[in-house]
């Protein structure tokens, strides 16, 4: 594990736009509403066996929160929130229950890792799901233009090997994109502008953390 101090926050992907850098070049960015979050629990190595901080984000009607979750928020002394996530840190002593976590934690951060749920595409064929070339458009091909093709042997081995790329459910997976550059931090609006695309749909929940690999070597 690297010696980089890991910081993290929960946020909502708002969509993509573009900005201009210092040299007037167009930079595509994803706008993330990062926080504000609140610390609902601090895990320590002595009690829990590891160091982590639990943060909560998003408003929710208290009547829609079940009793176990309601009790958890009440114990922390905070109002109920819609989303909860746990961020592993090297040292959790700097956090306190009830403390606010805002986008300001990324003021001195250049690169981040973003985790979200990728767009779901439902049941998809081999060409869409894996980028297969497909088969010939003519010359004897009959209703098999987009089929996968051969998937293995015959009597030997008598089965299809595990991991064979075939048609199936595509997307809706937890995905992490690493070493994305922070283009801008807007503390007044709780917005984080990240260069490039991040996983998920507009309005999807994402976890933004300090890049564990330290960012690109520039």
UniProtKB/Swiss-Prot annotation:
SUPFAM superfamilies: Translation proteins (SSF50447). GO terms for biological process: translation. One of its GO terms (molecular function) is structural constituent of ribosome. GO terms for cellular component: cytosolic large ribosomal subunit. Keywords: Ribonucleoprotein, Ribosomal protein, RNA-binding, rRNA-binding. The keyword ATP-binding does not apply. InterPro entries: Ribosomal_uL3, Ribosomal_uL3_bac/org-type, Ribosomal_uL3_CS, Transl_B-barrel_sf. Part of the 50S ribosomal subunit. Forms a cluster with proteins L14 and L19. PANTHER family: 50S RIBOSOMAL PROTEIN L3, LARGE RIBOSOMAL SUBUNIT PROTEIN UL3C. One of the primary rRNA binding proteins, it binds directly near the 3'-end of the 23S rRNA, where it nucleates assembly of the 50S subunit. Belongs to the universal ribosomal protein uL3 family. This is Large ribosomal subunit protein uL3. It comes from Corynebacterium urealyticum (strain ATCC 43042 / DSM 7109).
């Amino acid at each position: 594990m690297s010696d980089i101090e890991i910081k993290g926050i929960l946020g909502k992907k708002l969509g993509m736009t573009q900005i201009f850098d210092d040299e007037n070049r167009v930079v595509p960015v994803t706008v993330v509403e990062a926080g504000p979050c609140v610390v609902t629990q601090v895990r320590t190595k002595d009690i829990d066996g590891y160091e982590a901080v639990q943060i909560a984000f998003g408003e929710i009607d208290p009547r829609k929160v079940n009793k176990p979750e309601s009790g958890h928020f009440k114990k922390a002394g905070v109002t109920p929130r819609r989303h909860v996530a746990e961020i592993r840190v090297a040292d959790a002593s700097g956090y306190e229950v009830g403390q606010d976590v805002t986008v300001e934690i990324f003021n001195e951060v250049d690169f981040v890792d973003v985790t979200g749920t990728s767009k779901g595409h439902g049941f998809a064929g081999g060409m869409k799901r894996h980028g297969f070339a497909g088969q010939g458009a003519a010359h004897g091909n009959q209703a098999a233009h987009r089929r996968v093709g051969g998937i293995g042997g015959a009597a030997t081995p008598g089965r299809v090997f595990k991991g064979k790329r075939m048609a199936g459910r595509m997307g809706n997976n937890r995905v992490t994109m690493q070493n994305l550059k922070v283009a801008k931090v807007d503390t007044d609006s709780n917005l984080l502008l990240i260069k490039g695309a991040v996983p998920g749909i507009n309005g999807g929940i994402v976890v933004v953390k300090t890049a564990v690999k330290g960012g690109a070597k520039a």
